[in-house]
Structures are given as structure tokens and as C-alpha cells.
Amino acid sequence: MRGFFRQRRSVSPPGHPYDRTGPGEHAGPGARTGPGGRPRVLGVRGLRARGIRTGLRWKLSAAIALVGALVAIALSLVVHNAARVSMLDNARDLADDRVLIAQRNYELSGRQNFPNAQIDDPALPPELRRKIDAGRRATYVSERPDGVTDIWAAVPLKDGHVMSLHSGFTDRSADILSDLDQALVIGSIAVVLGGSALGVLIGGQLSRRLREAAAAANRVASGEPDVRVRDAIGGVVRDETDDVARAVDAMADALQQRIEAERRVTADIAHELRTPVTGLLTAAELLPPGRPTELVLDRAKAMRTLVEDVLEVARLDGASERAELQDIMLGDFVSRRVAAKDPAVEVRVIHESEVTTDPRRLERVLFNLLANAARHGRSPVEVSVEGRVIRVRDHGPGFPEDLLAEGPSRFRTGSTDRAGRGHGLGLTIAAGQARVLGARLTFRNVRPAGAPAHIPAEGAVAVLWLPEHAPTNTGSYPMLPDRSKSGASSSARDMSREASQGMSRKP
């Protein structure tokens, strides 16, 4: 038998006060704790390791629910133990009062006539008997193997005997504890559910604002400088999301100002060079015929072309260009333009299609792609038209990796073996004109099926995807291939196939 006791000094004459000098109360055997005296908490692990992507609202809800559950469990244990200890203290006080009354009756009448009181009970716990032998009145709580709690109270008599009183923890007290536990469980569940709902509500609001901020930032990145992230997220409450939005807006404004300043400087320099270069070319044409004159004319023409290209890039960067739309038959248009430009280039019209586009800008894109293939690739150069898709392929070393990863960039040729063979403006202009047309310009390298990336490319393909509908604005730049999307049409399937084969080559 195990338990705990509370001792009291015995009284000699009736009515003598007694003191309570025993050890402090024990929490009792009814405390429901796990191993080591702590409740066991099971966690969920491996979400990041498994690559599971969850929304902010669910993370916040789970965190609030977990904290609420832990707090509810801790408070429930504290309340349960406090209630049990309080009820045991009341039961011990009652047993102590009853044994004191039984002692007085026995000493007054000389016989034991109090219910449930016994003299020299052989079942008296040894721990309680030792306290009684010390001349003190005491109470003791023990627990049977079957979980039933017993309450003992004993007092030494003047004649040397020991009077004890034994009672069980009443069913009524057990029912009260059971009802209390049930109320605590219901309250804990309500706290967890309420916390989860609150987490979903708060997290959903925050997640929505973050999604709107991300969408607005993507619009700014795609070429819409007038979009403001702070205006996009809205809301009356000011929090960290507003700080992020203001920081993104400030960064976008600073970048836009720098880009605009760079564009203006480039345009001003090119414009200032245009007049003297034209004069130089005119003067070179007046020189007497001969090899030196041809060299001067060739370099003067190259300089004029460079100046014109720089001016065109500056205009395209200003996002002020507008397409002059016409309805054309794409296959026939490409065939006639390529034949006039370079009859040696093979043109195949797989599927004819009528498109609404700007013929001048489309011709500019097509000629720049052909010039790039002729300059940096190897023959034969092939052009194919399939619906709204134009492909230009050569059999050279392929595009450089940085071009495939980042897109065309001015004054970057992308390969050391082509030093001095270009300024990196051809594909930059082609990409800018494609943007004005609302088209998409993509690049990829051709390798044998299943060949690793280090195997040299067997050719390069530039693909122009004309839009199904006529462009209504020029605020977005052409995108590189999106490997996560594929369509049902043959052109969409081809785009997915091209994007999966990797990218590499020239500017």
C-alpha cells in the first residue's frame, strides 16, 4: 500500500488546540501524467524533407492549434490535479474532525460508539502508526492496487490505544472529477478548433496580401513600371507586408530611373554620333575607287548600322513602340521575304495560317534571326512555318548557355570564339520587336536524343511564337520557354519538347 499522510499533534484535554506541522500535501496518485511526469507530445516531422508545400494560412493555423493544444493540456492537468488535491484535503479535514469527535466521545463515555471508528485497527498503515506512536494525530491517504483511494485518520488515546477512522474517496467526489475532466476535454477541443479557425482567418488574410504583392511584383518584372505593390495589396491594417510592398516599390522606382537614365544616355550618344557618321560615310563615297576606299566604306557602313541599332534598342526599351497591324498569310510572307533576302535558305511551309501582325517588325525579327544564323552558325540554314510558329535553324555550335539562361543582352556576344564578330544587338532587337508584336521568342540547342549536356550541340533553333490575337499593348517582354506548360496544339507540344531539350548559344 502506498500513500501519503498529514500529521497533527494530539490533544490531552478536550478542546485543546492542535497544530498542523506535518509535511506538505502530496499531489496524490490521481495525477494523470506521462513518463517522467510530463505529458507526451507527438510532432509531425519531415514536411520540408518530403517537399510538401503548404500555404501560410495552414502553417499559421497549425501553429496556433498546436500551441492551443499544449496550453489546454497543461491547464487541464493543472486544474485536474488542483481539484483532486483540494477534494482530498477536504476529505482529510472531514476525517480529522470525525476522528476528533470520536476521541472525545470515547474519552467521555469510555466506550466506542462512533460509526466506522475502530480501536487498534490491524489494517492501520505502518506509516500512519509510526506517527501515532510519536503522540500525534494524523491523516493518511493511500491507494489500492485497483485504483481506489482510501482516507485514514487516527489519534492516540490516553489509555494507550489508537483510535482510527477509515473511509473511501466517495463516489460523489469521483463523479465530480469525471465531470470536470469531461468539461476540460470539451473546452480544450473548443480552444483548438477556435484557434485553428482564427489561424485560417488571419493566415488567409496575410496569405492573400502576399499573393497580391507577388503578383504585382511579377507584373513590374514583366515590364509594367506603373504598377504599385502597395496599391495592389490594399487593406487598412498596416503590417510588415506593407513594409515589404513599399520597399519593393522603392526598389522598382530606383531601377526604373536607372534604366531610363541609361536609355537616355545611350540614345543621346547614338543620336549625336548619327550625324558625323553619316557625314563620314558620304565623304568616304567621294574617295577615289580602290581597296582603301572599300575598307573605309565598309567600316563606315558598319558604324552607321551600329548607331542605328543602338537607337532602335533605345526606342524599344522606352516601351513606346506600337505595332501597325495588318492581316497577312504567314507562310507566303516568310517565303517571299526569305527568298528576297537569301535565296540559299530553305523555307518549308508546313501549315499556312493567316495572322494579324506588323509586317515591317516581323520582317525585322526574321532578318535578324537569319543574320544571326549566318554569322554565328553554319549552313544549311532552314526556315519552317507551322501555323503561327516560325523556326530558324542552323547547324552551328549552338547558343551560349548564358543567353539561354538570361535571354539576349546588348553588347554581349555570349561566346569567346566570336570575339569581334558582333555587338550582341541583333537578338536584342529581335526580342524587343517580338515584344511589340506580342509574340514570344525562344531559343534552344539541338543535340542527339539522350545526349548529355557536355556533348557539343549540332545546331541552334530560334522560334518565334506569334500570338493568336492581335496585340493590344506592349507592356510585356517576350518570355523564355515555360517548361511547366504544354498545350494541345502541335505548336504547343513542340514548345514543350523544345524547352525539355535544354538551351545553349549565341546572342
From Swiss-Prot:
EC class: transferase
NCBIfam families assigned to the protein according to its UniProt record, in alphabetical order: hist_kin_CseC
Gene Ontology terms for molecular function: ATP binding; phosphorelay sensor kinase activity
Enzyme Commission (EC) number: 2.7.13.3
Coiled coil ranges: none
Reaction(s) catalysed by this chain's protein: ATP + protein L-histidine = ADP + protein N-phospho-L-histidine
Organism listed in the record: Streptomyces coelicolor (strain ATCC BAA-471 / A3(2) / M145)
Keywords, comma-separated and alphabetical: ATP-binding, Cell membrane, Kinase, Membrane, Nucleotide-binding, Phosphoprotein, Transferase, Transmembrane, Transmembrane helix, Two-component regulatory system
Entry GO terms, CC: plasma membrane
Biased composition (Gly residues): 25-37
Primary role: Member of the two-component regulatory system CseB/CseC involved in the stability of the cell envelope, through activation of transcription of RNA polymerase sigma-E factor. CseC functions as a membrane-associated protein kinase that phosphorylates CseB in response to changes in the cell envelope.
Keyword RNA-binding: no
Major localization class: membrane
Protein name: Sensor protein CseC
Positions of the UniProt region annotated as Disordered: 1-42, 472-507
Domain Histidine kinase: 268-470
Residues covered by the HAMP domain: 204-260
Bias (Polar residues) ranges: 486-507
Membrane topology according to the record: Multi-pass membrane protein
Pfam families: HAMP, HATPase_c, HisKA
Annotated compartments: Cell membrane
SMART domains reported in the protein's UniProt record: HAMP (SM00304), HATPase_c (SM00387), HisKA (SM00388)
Gene3D superfamilies: 1.10.287.130, 6.10.340.10, Histidine kinase-like ATPase, C-terminal domain (3.30.565.10)
Gene: cseC
Signal peptide: none
CDD domains: HATPase, HisKA
Domain of life of the source: Bacteria
Chain positions with Phosphohistidine modification: H271
